Amino acid sequence: MGSLVRLAGAAIGYGRPLLRDLDLEVRSGDFLAVVGPNGGGKTTLLRTLLGSLPPLGGRREAAPSLRVGYVPQREAVDPLWPLSAGDVVLMGRVRRAGPGARLDDADRERARHALERVGLADLWHRTFHNLSGGQRQRTLIARALAAEPDLLALDEPTSGMDPAAELAAMDLLRDLHQGGLAVVMVSHRLEAVANYAARLAFADQGRGLWRVGTLDEMLRPEALSALYGRPVTVREENGRRFVYPEAGGGRAA
């Protein structure tokens, strides 16, 4: 697998470092999930990795002509514009073609294919604001896919979803990854990614903590206990892994 983007000895933050000495590489076919508490530096790390925020120290290296499909945590589509789901997905083709470029039938076909990949082929003409929350998120993922990216990057893609919608969204990302797409996502919920990602990174700028490893390495109870600062156990139920604080009180976030 080839390297897509890499941070070496990086310090990240806005004006002052939130986290230092970060070494992280994303390769073709990777599925990396960045987890940690709210305000822990996850989005800052993602923005630095994608190049929209320069590192304060160290360096960032990216493959030539790297194409990234980005799905932000919150997307504001002005309700005064009655955009259809298809219109939103076509924005991805505009980004791929560049400012001022005119879209042709081939662009529309690729956009339709992107919407089909996320299971919404029959909603091309549906007004975006009349979609459910889960359908809107899938449409935004389709917009990112329409740009034919090498890397799909998502910031809290399941935020605000109910458990069924979260599971469906993660199943979609698993399918896209298994189809050969590299995926990097940010989540504050470890359980959302524990059965999907190939690697986990943990970021908590409040404690200056940064760890990255394979899923098996990071989901060891002793590793999680050190990261979360309290005893944690991992159980497998019906083929899925769940994370629990040993003191009781339900699953860990």
Language-model segments: residues:
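ABC ATPase nucleotide-binding domains
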Residues: 221-253
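Helix-to-loop junction immediately C-terminal to a conserved catalytic motif
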Residues: 50
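H-loop/switch region of ABC-family ATPase nucleotide-binding domains
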Residues: 187-188
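Conserved ABC ATPase signature
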Residues: 127-131, 135
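Conserved catalytic motifs of ABC-family nucleotide-binding domains
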Residues: 148
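Catalytic Walker B motif of ABC-type/P-loop ATPase nucleotide-binding domains
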Residues: 152-155
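Conserved ABC ATPase "signature" region
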Residues: 10, 90, 105-123
